[in-house]
Amino acid sequence: MTDQQRALNYMNYLAVDELLSLQRPVSDGPEHDELLFITIHQVYELWFKQLLHEIEQAQREMDAVRTQDVLATLNRVKVILAVCIRQVDVLVTMTPLQFNTFRDRLESASGFQSAQFRELEAVLGRRDHRFAAHLLPEHRAKVEARVSAPSLWDSALAYLNACEFSIPEEILDRDVAQPYKHDDRVTAAVLEVYRSGHQAALVCEQLVDIEVSLRE
């Protein structure tokens, strides 16, 4: 192979040939719609990976009280979530009858087995050690590590406290592996953020927008 052939280009930088080889239908034929099914779910997994990457970045920026960076990163999270939601529009072009032409070949495979989705749930605050029980050990370990680490909300509370909006110490020091429990003092602190006109209010708005997106 010549140096020119080895030079970085679009195809080898993105590993396009390898990427396009990863859609592997299991149905005989194969069934036409199975490729769409595989592609959509693989794309979801890529977006889950990116969301985890961005949320980790937002948490680092919150720790450093870099408000403008936090806003930019949370906005990206929000936009990616919107893309994930719109992607459903493509999936629903497949009718139940079309799906049933290959569903039996999938055996027990299910979207509920997505380890990255469980990681995403954990980093966004879900605290349930049972939801990783059915995963393979290596995937279960990753989910359990997320459950035991500060969630995005935990990072946000520490950020608000660093911005001099008083968050009770026992909440900042709580066991983050346990579910967050509503506290009126935190609500009061968030209301004070909004009343103050501080840019932290924009961060709170981004977090609300993300929560709304997750409910769609």
Which residues fall in each region the model found?
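Surface-exposed peri-terminal alpha-helical interaction modules
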Residues: M1-E216
